[in-house]
């Protein structure tokens, strides 16, 4: 029996089983694509997970080219945005209080 894997036809090979809802979550990486017809093996999913965890450095992966500084700069931008919003809310509250005192 010939099986097609990734565009290649393998002669005398058993066709890999497709993941389905009936296969359950714990078998052969079925949690990745339950019912969607995605073929996943435990070895392949482990290799992908290992490649993601052993990447060089810590980065956000946003394509910004910031490398390890990405999380630091995004954190600083978040703090600056939060400080701006707090100041803006205090200013609005002060204007409302001043208008209430004037009447």
Swiss-Prot record:
Disruption phenotype: Deletion of the probable mamGFDC operon leads to a slight reduction in magnetic response and slightly narrower magnetite crystals. Residues 60-67 are annotated as: LG repeat. It is found in: Magnetosome membrane. It comes from the Bacteria. GO terms for cellular component: magnetosome membrane. It is a multi-pass membrane protein. Residues 49-59 are lumenal. Keywords: Biomineralization, Magnetosome, Membrane, Transmembrane, Transmembrane helix. Residues 1-27, 81-103 are cytoplasmic. The chain crosses the membrane at residues 28-48, 60-80. This bacteria makes up to 20 cubo-octahedral magnetosomes of about 45 nm in diameter which contain membrane-bound crystals of magnetite (Fe(3)O(4)). Belongs to the magnetosome MamG (TC 9.B.95) protein family. Plays a role in regulating magnetite crystal size. This is Magnetosome protein MamG. It comes from Paramagnetospirillum magneticum (strain ATCC 700264 / AMB-1).
């Amino acid at each position: 029996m010939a099986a097609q894997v990734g565009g290649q036809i393998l002669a005398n090979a058993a066709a890999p089983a497709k993941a389905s809802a009936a296969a359950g979550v714990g078998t052969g990486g079925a949690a990745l694509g339950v019912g969607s017809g995605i073929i996943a093996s435990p070895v392949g999913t482990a290799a992908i997970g290992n490649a993601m965890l052993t990447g060089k450095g810590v980065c956000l992966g946003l394509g910004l080219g910031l490398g390890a500084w990405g999380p630091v700069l995004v954190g600083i931008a978040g703090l600056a945005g939060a400080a701006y919003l707090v100041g803006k809310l205090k200013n609005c509250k002060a204007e409302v209080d001043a208008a209430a005192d004037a009447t």
